[in-house]
Swiss-Prot record:
Keywords, ordered alphabetically: Ribonucleoprotein, Ribosomal protein, RNA-binding, rRNA-binding
Family per record: Belongs to the universal ribosomal protein uL14 family.
GO terms under cellular component: cytosolic large ribosomal subunit
Function in brief: Binds to 23S rRNA. Forms part of two intersubunit bridges in the 70S ribosome.
Name the record gives this protein: Large ribosomal subunit protein uL14
Quaternary structure, from the entry: Part of the 50S ribosomal subunit. Forms a cluster with proteins L3 and L19. In the 70S ribosome, L14 and L19 interact and together make contacts with the 16S rRNA in bridges B5 and B8.
PANTHER family linked to this entry: 50S/60S RIBOSOMAL PROTEIN L14/L23, LARGE RIBOSOMAL SUBUNIT PROTEIN UL14M
Alphabetical GO biological process terms: translation
Highest taxon above the source species: Bacteria
SUPFAM superfamilies the record matches: Ribosomal protein L14
Alphabetized SMART domains for the sequence: Ribosomal_L14 (SM01374)
UniProt GO MF annotations: large ribosomal subunit rRNA binding; structural constituent of ribosome
Record Pfam families: Ribosomal_L14 (PF00238)
Length: 122
């Protein structure tokens, strides 16, 4: 469950290390975002000479949450940290690599690129 002011790790090689959620997209009063939801983020920490700089604002898709996701069979998949992948204006990933596992819930038409780049799909 990600809300405004939540900080997330970045799970791609765009150059950003930590981002902060500044808006949950998808409705005028939407409060929380879960896995597969798009949020607006500000880069808080970045590596030198990278594409993403500190202070830049991007769209991002949430790929891992501490809250986790409940499957229809009753199982729950949770993670230790919240993580997101930075997206460009066309909602395509900025980075060319994805770090760490992602969930099967991202297998929509929109995020198949992220699923195919991920080392593990849970």
């Amino acid at each position: 469950m990600i809300q405004m002011q939540s900080t997330l790790d970045v799970a791609c090689n765009s150059g950003a290390r930590r981002v902060q959620c500044i808006k949950v997209l998808g409705g005028s009063h939407r409060r929380y975002a879960g896995i597969g939801d798009i949020i607006k983020v500000s880069v808080k920490e970045a590596i030198p000479r990278a594409k993403a700089k500190k202070g830049d604002v991007y769209n991002a898709v949430v790929v891992r949450t501490k809250k986790g996701v409940r499957r229809p069979d009753g199982s729950v998949i949770r993670f230790d940290r919240n993580a997101a992948v930075l997206l460009n204006n066309n909602l395509q990933p900025i980075g060319t690599r994805i770090f760490g596992p992602v969930t099967r819930e991202l297998r929509s038409e929109q995020f198949m690129k992220i699923v195919s780049l991920a080392p593990e799909v849970l």
